Amino acid sequence: VSGIDIAALRRMVTTIEGNDPQGSFANQGQTDFGRTRSFTLGLAGADAAFPHGLAGDALHEVFAENPGAHMAATGFALAFAARAAERAIEPRRPIIWIEEESAASEYGGLYPPGLHAFGIDPSRLLIVRCPTAQDVLKAANDALEAGTGGKASHLVSGVVASVTGQPKCLDLTASRRLLLATETAQLPVILLRSHRTAVQSAAVSRWRVAPAPSRSSGANAPGKPVFSAVLERNRHGTCGQWIMEWNNETQEFGANERDGRTSVSRPLVSVSADRPASQQRSA
């Protein structure tokens, strides 16, 4: 697809929530508009870099340190979106995940059992696949512009837009357009990129992510997902670097204390079920 069918989106949201489609949106104009929500990540050191919290109505950028780290960046973006969704105007609404069709075949797609293990209910994700990066950006803007007067924030709790490579369409102007749309919609957008780029961006925060060793949970079994995260840009605070462990039970980041235990690698949640094991990337 090259855009978002808003009527279909409303029907899907209604199905997920089990609400009457008339009643779900009847009183939107009377609730929550004009409210800006901030959120935290859960790791004290990282949260301290944002004195007023991370903006819940802004564009945040996450990119892989190198092409082999794309799966780690995907997991980080997923966790980031889950944290942001908790503070959304309608936190129970789905997160829209928009990606290029080529990304699933190259890196693997989001896998329901893996999402469960990550602490994310797969039914909360509406996955949209688009032919090109230009279509991904258009679909993201369509989702943010659903309805008028900020009503998108009553349809979804966040948007992740994933692009591969360094498409020319994703320039400073395009990112500014996304930022303005997030502010109007009162929704967070996480722009996930497979490659680092020197192109300027309007994102209020910019994260460079790579996989890090996890603590074994026992019997040399994989532990919780761990990320090496570098905050390269922070419009509302300071920058820094942290080793961040994702807790799938509490759905928050924490410090990765090694405790002298064996460190092991583990597959990321976005590994596709239909790809040979030899092609699956791990963190």
Which role does the model predict for each range below?
Residues V1, H236-A283:
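C-terminal regions of RecA-like/P-loop NTPase motor modules
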Residues V1-W97, E101, G114, F118-S123, ...:
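Detector for small/aliphatic-rich hydrophobic stretches
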Residues P91-G158, S162:
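Conserved inter-motif catalytic segment of the P-loop NTP-binding fold
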Residues I98, I190-L192, A210:
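Generic beta-sheet signal
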Residues S105-P112, S194-P211:
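Glycine-rich, charge-decorated loop segments at or immediately adjacent to ligand/cofactor-binding or catalytic sites
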Residues H116, A203-K224:
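Acidic, Ser/Thr-rich peripheral helices and adjacent loops at domain boundaries
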Residues T148-G150, L155-Q200:
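A contiguous pocket-lining binding segment that forms or flanks enzyme active sites
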Residues A219-G237:
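A conserved mid-domain beta-alpha-beta active-site/ligand-binding segment of alpha/beta enzyme cores
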